[in-house]
Structures are given as structure tokens and as C-alpha cells.
UniProtKB/Swiss-Prot annotation:
Disulfide bonds join 26-63, 36-54, 130-216, 172-189, 186-199, 257-271. CDD domains: PBP2_transferrin. Keywords: Cell membrane, Disulfide bond, Glycoprotein, GPI-anchor, Ion transport, Iron, Iron transport, Lipoprotein, Membrane, Metal-binding, Repeat, Signal, Transport, Zinc. This is Melanotransferrin. Glycans are attached at residues 118, 135, 515. It comes from Oryctolagus cuniculus.
Length: 736
């Protein structure tokens, strides 16, 4: 008995390793089952091996489950189903379909407009849209998914149909007539010549399918059509038979590109919304891909040409379309990199992520982390205000002791979201694996919340030096622990290897790197003397090097004054500092005569730049705050909630009973969000903490953090980096 069991085990193991002695193809309908059985018979009569068996499922999703459960082996799926099968069940694509020799195993989803219009990808809100059909790949899934993923379209509560109906100024989406939003989504549809079949997902609707969506645009019903890359060329320049297209010329239409530009309809390879992968045969990870391809390759060699007894790539005999394989398939090819991510490609993957929102799996609450009594009060009012407006998911407020405690609780799944500053975003991402879900946008002229850190010098050809020659120079800093004056420049110099602290003593290392400095601090008595050497105190010479306005070289303007008056050679300040104190903007005697053109910036690449070139020549950009969540949280639902909420509560003068970006009613500042916030914004492509913070800021931060010593930390989480240094114990520094 034991030998028989061992033999059976070996047999099953060999069967699994070799992909089994037969291939069980899963079908999703009766017609497909019939075609599969005919293909099985044709293969058998031709002597093809292994044997092909047919297993009938109820749908493509059901077939995927059967394959995962080892009750079937293979099925052909479209891109969206491949994504789900790979992500949820670990299936892999092994054989791809080829439709067009020019583009191979893919085609392209494009957005088409009339050349005479001024529509771009950034101005689609409010325009009229034409779609091939509801849930169609290029007409719905890709454009809607792309708009959501890029942050152009916000979706609350996973209600994609509602979001689209409110985003466009009317649409024709054949098949949307049975939805709650048919008034908007079917507004442009016309039906057939007798007015029948309006908004049907069938040829009864004249604007259905690729040609129909393009006709919707061509006839002026819509402003943009979401179609395939070949649609325009197939229906213009005399290539179309229907009368509506006889006079159309391809040169009268253009494509919308992802970067906001437009291009000729022939330039679809670089101007498109996404490359759409061809359908592919998927199997379990343990299935021999070579065996599957060899069987299908022998099959297509015998049964893909006219006159053969069985037609692999035709469904006409069964009264259906695209059974087992797409009817437009020219050939099947093996897939080299057998992962769903590689097959689908980044553009299509991003579009699918934008659509991955199941209302039935949406948590009823978003648990927000709060850190103080005033913040608890504001969060409670926010929860009530959101609930009254039926915003989803609802807000729950959960207290924590510190930003780091919030991060721990979010990672553990006990809390869902918290707004953090730049340094804490770095910790949340690097240590706890959190990701940004939304960010804060400050006013364009906001000089305290969004700025670049720059190194300013005098324009002097006789004494010109670069960032590589800072050693031995005299430096001016707004204050110890300030982001622009200390954390970023010192962190950058450490990261670049110019400053090399010993035994974590950054203060001494900075003092030795520069010849002399002015770095105002709260308690200069316990401080390296070289860091106060350039400070001058007040008009009477008192309060020298103190971290307040009594020191004339304190703050950004003070550090710039230190440079102006010749005390220092370089000033580390915000990019706005030069303009605040030159060209008549500062009437104080020391600044009244200054001109901005007399100052330059030191660039990290060793060059110098004009003061107005700060965006390209800076040490780092201070990032805005961001809402951080777990990676398994749907960031589009978080932003969708905040975006809908700010329409109601974002204006500080709104009459709806709550102000998202104002904390004055709670006797606090920057509660839940910074009070300077103008709007919550989507993260777009900045989906990791590194992307959000930017490489220069991360480098500076990590340069500083590399000097942390165990047991040296005394500051509370969220404080500036330098309380971790032995000589700075006890200093209370402001956060970013």
C-alpha cells in the first residue's frame, strides 16, 4: 500500500512538473465550449500532444479560480483580467496574440480631438466625450483609469460612473443607459436612423464601437473621442464606406499627449494614453510554458489558414466573436518575461490601478490620526460635517502620542491616515513603508510653506568660487535647526562628502569646515565658538548669536544681511530672500540700495546661476505636507474624499459649517492640515515617499540622519534633526 502511495505521489509530481499529460482549457460560455471541443478533436485527429481537454466555466473570473485550484490549466484573457489573475491568483501569461505586424502584441489607446479645437489632456474637465462603450478597454477602462491615476479625475466612494458623469460635460458611453447616471453618460448618443437603440452597447447605437466613437467626434456631438490608434486612419482620407466619413481628412484631427501637448494622428507610438497589451494565454506558475506554446504553435501551423478543417482564429461558425482567441489574431507567440507586470507594461498597469476600486470592499471608515486636544475637536467636527454631506468613507478620529506613534498604528492597521511634514514623511516611508495618498498645495506666493533652499553669493569675478570650494569660506545661516539654513545645506554637504563628522559631532565638523560662521541658536553658551564668530548681536552689540531677532543676522533676511555686509561669503536661505531684500523691497538702510542682479546662486553641479534661476539651481525643494497611508489603502478613495470635501469646506469663507484649512476656531495652528493649504492635491506619479520628497531633499535628510547616534536622541518626533547631536541636547527646534 505504501509503495502504491509513493508511486501515485511520484506520478502526480511528474505530472505537475511537466505541465500534466493533457492541457485542460477553460471556456466561459456554451459557444466557446463547442469551439473548444472542435479544436480538441482537430488536434487529436492531427496527432498533436499533449491532449487538449475542455473544462466549462461560467465566466472568465470563474475560469481563473478553476485554474488556481488545479481544476483547469489555461485560458486566454484580456489585459484587465490578466491583471486580476496575476495579482490575485499568481497566474502568468505564456502565449500572446499578434493582431498587426506593425505594433506586434499590443495596440494603443488614444484620445482624439479636432485640430481646430484647443483641448488638451489638462483641459478635459467639462468637455463632451465619446466612448466606444462602457467597460471597453480603449473607450473606457484606459482613459478613465488614466485620468484617475494621474489625479485629473477624483472618485469618491469608488463611484466611478458618478465621477465621470460629473467630470465631462456630457458623454456617449454606449451601455451606460441602465446606470443611475444615464442622463449624462448617454446625453450625446443618437441611436439608429429611426432613433431606436439610443445608448445601446450594440451597432444600433451609431456612436458605438471604435468607428462610432470617432463619428461622435467628427459630427460635432463630442469634443474628444477615446479610440484605438488606427481608428482615425481607418475612417478618413476616403478609406471609409459610410457617407458620414467620406469627406473626413486625417490631417484635421490630432492626438492628446500625456504631457499636455498634441501630435499628428500618425504619431500614436509616442503620443497615447497607454499601450494596451494583446490578449494572452495564462496558466499557473508551475505550468510548463514551453509545453503550452508547442501545442498551440503546432495547432496554428495546421489550423490558421483558409481551407483548413478547423479555424483557430475564427468564431463565425459558432455565431459569436472572439471565442478562445480574438478573431483578429494573426498568430500566437511565446512570451519571454512571464509576469503580468511585464506583459501589461507600466502605462496600462497605472490605468488599471486607477480603476481598482470595489465599492463592496471599501471600508466604511477612514481612521484619522490626531495628536492633541484641539486636533481631536477639529477632527470630530470634520467627521460630522463630512457625514452630513454623505461623503464616503466616513471619518473616525483616533488619538496617538506622536507622529511616530501614528506611523506605528497605521502600519499595524489600527489607524489609516495622518498628515505629516517632510522629515516625518521620510520616516513614515523608509521605516514604516507608508505611501503618500494626497498632498497640500499652498498659494503661489506663499513664502513659508513651499520654497527652494539656495546658497547665495555675491557676483564677484575676482573672488568667484563654486559649491566645490566652500571649505574655508565664511558662512551665514538663518538659525540652528532651520530647514533652509541648517538641515538641508549641512545635510547636503555631509551627503556629498565635503563634511565628515567624527563621533556624530556635526557641530564641530561644520565649525571646522567653514572658516567662521553665524548660526544663531537659543543657547549659544554651550556652542562651538566658530559658529557664532560672524554674529553681531543687536545695535549695542548685546545678544550676540541668540536665536531671535535681537541678533541682526538671525533669520533669512539676517543671513542675507550677513553676506551683504561682508561678514560672510555665502548665505544659505530660502529662494525668496534675495527678492525680499533687493530692488526696493526692503527700505531698511542696509538693503535699500541692493540689486538682485548683484547676487548669484551656487549650483550642486559646480556652476553658478542667476538669482531667478532658483528652480534649476538649488540645494533642495522643501516638500509640502502629505497624507500618508498603508500601501494596501486605495489612495484614490482618500484623495476622492478630500477633493469632494474641499469643494464644500476648503474655502475659509464657506457657509457650510466647517473649514478644512483653518484652525483658528480651535485655538491652534495647522490642525489636521496646514492652515496655509489652498487645496488638497493628488500625488499623481509621486507615489512613494522618495518621489514626494524629491532626490535632493532625501539626500540632504539622509546625509544628516547618517550622523545619528544611538542614545543621543532627545528631541520629540517631528522636531528638527539636530537635537540628536551631543552638543545640542535640550534645544527645542521647530519642525519643518
Amino acid at each position: 500500500m505504501r509503495c502504491r502511495s509513493a508511486a501515485m505521489w511520484i506520478f502526480l509530481a511528474l505530472r505537475t512538473a511537466l505541465g500534466s499529460v493533457e492541457v485542460r482549457w477553460c471556456t466561459a460560455s456554451e459557444p466557446e465550449q463547442q469551439k473548444c471541443e472542435d479544436m480538441s478533436q482537430a488536434f487529436r485527429e492531427a496527432g498533436l500532444q499533449p491532449a487538449l481537454l475542455c473544462v466549462q466555466g461560467t465566466s472568465a473570473d470563474h475560469c481563473v479560480q478553476l485554474i488556481a485550484a488545479h481544476e483547469a490549466d489555461a485560458i486566454t484573457l484580456d489585459g484587465g483580467a490578466i491583471y486580476e489573475a496575476g495579482k490575485e491568483h499568481g497566474l502568468k501569461p505564456v502565449v500572446g496574440e499578434v493582431y498587426d505586424q506593425e505594433v506586434g502584441t499590443s495596440y494603443y489607446a488614444v484620445a482624439v480631438v479636432k485640430r481646430s479645437s484647443n483641448v488638451t489632456i489638462n483641459t478635459l474637465r467639462g468637455v463632451k466625450s465619446c466612448h466606444t462603450g462602457i467597460n471597453r478597454t480603449v473607450g473606457w477602462n484606459v482613459p478613465v483609469g488614466y485620468l484617475v491615476d494621474s489625479g485629473r479625475l477624483s472618485v469618491m466612494g469608488c463611484d466611478v460612473l458618478k465621477a465621470v458623469s460629473e467630470y465631462f460635460g456630457g458623454s456617449c458611453v454606449p451601455g451606460a443607459g441602465e446606470t443611475r447616471y444615464s442622463e449624462s453618460l448617454c446625453r450625446l448618443c443618437r441611436g439608429d436612423t429611426s432613433g431606436e437603440g439610443v445608448c445601446d452597447k450594440s451597432p444600433l447605437e451609431r456612436y458605438y464601437d471604435y468607428s462610432g466613437a470617432f463619428r461622435c467626434l467628427a459630427e460635432g456631438a463630442g469634443d474628444v473621442a477615446f479610440v484605438k490608434h488606427s481608428t482615425v486612419l481607418e475612417n478618413t482620407d476616403g478609406r471609409t464606406l459610410p457617407s458620414w466619413g467620406h469627406m473626413l481628412m486625417s490631417r484635421d484631427f490630432e492626438l492628446l499627449c500625456r504631457d499636455g501637448s498634441r501630435a499628428s494622428v500618425t504619431e500614436w507610438q509616442h503620443c497615447h494614453l497607454a499601450r494596451v497589451p494583446a490578449h494572452a494565454v495564462v496558466v499557473r506558475a508551475d505550468t510548463d510554458a514551453g509545453l503550452i506554446f508547442r501545442l498551440l504553435n503546432e495547432g496554428q501551423r495546421l489550423f490558421s489558414h483558409e481551407g483548413s478543417s478547423f479555424q483557430m482564429f475564427s468564431s463565425e461558425a459558432y455565431g459569436q466573436k472572439n471565442l478562445l482567441f480574438k478573431d483578429s489574431t494573426l498568430e500566437l507567440v511565446p512570451i519571454a518575461t512571464q509576469t503580468y507586470e511585464a506583459w501589461l507594461g507600466p502605462e496600462y498597469l497605472h490605468a488599471m490601478k486607477g480603476l481598482l476600486c470595489d465599492p463592496n470592499r471599501l471600508p466604511p471608515y477612514l481612521r484619522w490620526c490626531v495628536l492633541s486636544t484641539p486636533e481631536i475637536q477639529k477632527c470630530g467636527d470634520m467627521a460630522v460635517a463630512f457625514s452630513r454631506q454623505r461623503l464616503k468613507p466616513e471619518i473616525q478620529c483616533v488619538s496617538a502620542e506622536s507622529p511616530q506613534h501614528c506611523m506605528e498604528q497605521i502600519q499595524a492597521g489600527h489607524i489609516d491616515a495622518v498628515t505629516l511634514n517632510g522629515e516625518d514623511i521620510h520616516t513614515a516611508g523608509k521605516t514604516y513603508g507608508l505611501i503618500p495618498a494626497a498632498g497640500e498645495l499652498y498659494a503661489a506666493d506663499d513664502r513659508s510653506n513651499s520654497y527652494f533652499v539656495v546658497a547665495v553669493v555675491k557676483r564677484d569675478s575676482a573672488y568667484a568660487f563654486t559649491v566645490d570650494e566652500l571649505r574655508g569660506k565664511r558662512s551665514c545661516h538663518p538659525g540652528f535647526g532651520s530647514p533652509a539654513g541648517w538641515d538641508v545645506p549641512v545635510g547636503a554637504l555631509i551627503h556629498w562628502g565635503y563634511i565628515r563628522p567624527r563621533n556624530c559631532d556635526v557641530l564641530t565638523a561644520v565649525g571646522q569646515f567653514f572658516n567662521a560662521s553665524c548660526v544663531p541658536v537659543n543657547n549659544p553658551k554651550k556652542y562651538p565658538s566658530s559658529l557664532c564668530a560672524l554674529c553681531v548681536g543687536d545695535e549695542q552689540g548685546r545678544n550676540k548669536c541668540t536665536g531671535n531677532s535681537q541678533e541682526r543676522y538671525y533669520g533669512d533676511s539676517g543671513a542675507f544681511r550677513c553676506l551683504v555686509e561682508g561678514a560672510g561669503d555665502v548665505a544659505f536661505v530660502k529662494h525668496t530672500t534675495i527678492f525680499d531684500n533687493t530692488n526696493g523691497h526692503n527700505p531698511e538702510p542696509w538693503a535699500a540700495h541692493l540689486r538682485s542682479q548683484d547676487y548669484e546662486l551656487l549650483c550642486p553641479n559646480g556652476a553658478r546661476a542667476e538669482a531667478h534661476q532658483f528652480a534649476a539651481c538649488n540645494l533642495a525643494q522643501i516638500p509640502s505636507h502629505a497624507v500618508m497611508v498603508r500601501p494596501d489603502t486605495n489612495i484614490f478613495t482618500v484623495y476622492g474624499l478630500l477633493d469632494k470635501a474641499q469643494d464644500l469646506f476648503g474655502d475659509d469663507h464657506n457657509k457650510n459649517g466647517f473649514k478644512m484649512f483653518d484652525s483658528s476656531s480651535y485655538h491652534g495652528r495647522d490642525l489636521l492640515f496646514k492652515d496655509a493649504t489652498v487645496r488638497a492635491v493628488p500625488v499623481g506619479e509621486r507615489t512613494t515617499y522618495q518621489d514626494w520628497l524629491g532626490p535632493d531633499y532625501v539626500a540632504a535628510l539622509e546625509g544628516m540622519q547618517s550622523q545619528r547616534c544611538s542614545g543621543a536622541a532627545v528631541g520629540a518626533p517631528g522636531a528638527s534633526l539636530l537635537p540628536l547631536l551631543p552638543l545640542a541636547v535640550g534645544l527645542l527646534l521647530s519642525s519643518l
